[in-house]
Amino acid sequence: MYHLLIIITTLSFSSINITFAVDEAFPSIPTTFSVATKQHYDVKPIHHEVYDGERKIYDISHQYTPELPVWESSEGLGNFLRLAVSMKNGSDANISKMELSVHSGTHVDAPGHFHDHYYESGFDTDSLDLQILNGPALLVDVPRDKNISAEVMKSLHIPRGIRRVLFKTLNTDRRLMFKKEFDSSFVGFMVDGAKWLVENTDIKLVGLDYLSFAAYDEAPATHRFILERRDIIPVEALKLDDVEVGMYTLHCLPLRLVGAEGAPTRCILIK
């Protein structure tokens, strides 16, 4: 009788379905499943690039992986992330640690990146203006056969009043951010293109689709020119392959790294 009772109880328990509260942060997880299978639940998260609901949201930040390219390296980001505390080793929780340059992946530059007096004065990523980093933005398609010179800037016909512009270039077509080897032939701003931008537009945020908004051969000079002004924010290594030309709402939120001249940044576009 005792054994029979155990069998009946087990069978009854396994047939019970329990409904849990819906967690919209994890839409891939169903809300009803068997208690008996709960411990062996084999759910897989969904990694979105585009969220298509009431509003279309584009994630224009790159994933941080060991293959992510880094400046002047053929090895990529490497093993930047490790599980320092592990439940498998008896701990109560999993805790990861990471080590990487603040200019890795999608990131912003602060004035102290190329100006030591600004670095010493505290012009860090925590001092960047969120009003500039968030708001209406124009995505433009750059001619594919050249860097962004004054001539190219003039040809784009960016109207006055536009404060945030994302430049989609040959870098996106070549998928350079998906290749771990650094490629110095990437498209970027020339010094004269940066000067034309300052003198003829109202742009305060410049977004580009590789590790530097400035072309490789003129990177120091172009960075110095733009960052010296302290009123233009470069956003680098944007992921623009899923996005069409046009107007969007941009949200860029850098980590608040006090004292740092750059910071990893989560950027999204909303249509």
Curated annotation (Swiss-Prot):
Kindly list any coiled-coil regions of this protein. Answer: none
A cellular component annotation (GO) from this entry: extracellular region
- Write the signal peptide boundaries: 1-21
Q: Does the keyword Lipid biosynthesis apply?
A: no
**Where found, per UniProt?**
Secreted, Extracellular space, Extracellular matrix
A Pfam family annotated for this UniProt entry:
Cyclase
Is the keyword Heme assigned to this protein? no
Give the record's keywords alphabetically. Answer: Extracellular matrix, Secreted, Signal
* Principal location listed in the UniProt entry: secreted
Q: Which GO terms describe its molecular function?
A: arylformamidase activity
Q: InterPro entries annotated for this entry?
A: KFase/CYL (IPR007325), KFase_sf (IPR037175)
Q: Biological process GO terms, please?
A: L-tryptophan catabolic process to kynurenine
Task: Tell me its family.
Answer: Belongs to the Cyclase 1 superfamily.
Protein's name according to its UniProt entry: Cyclase-like protein 3
Annotated organism of origin: Arabidopsis thaliana (Mouse-ear cress)
Gene for this chain: CYCLASE3
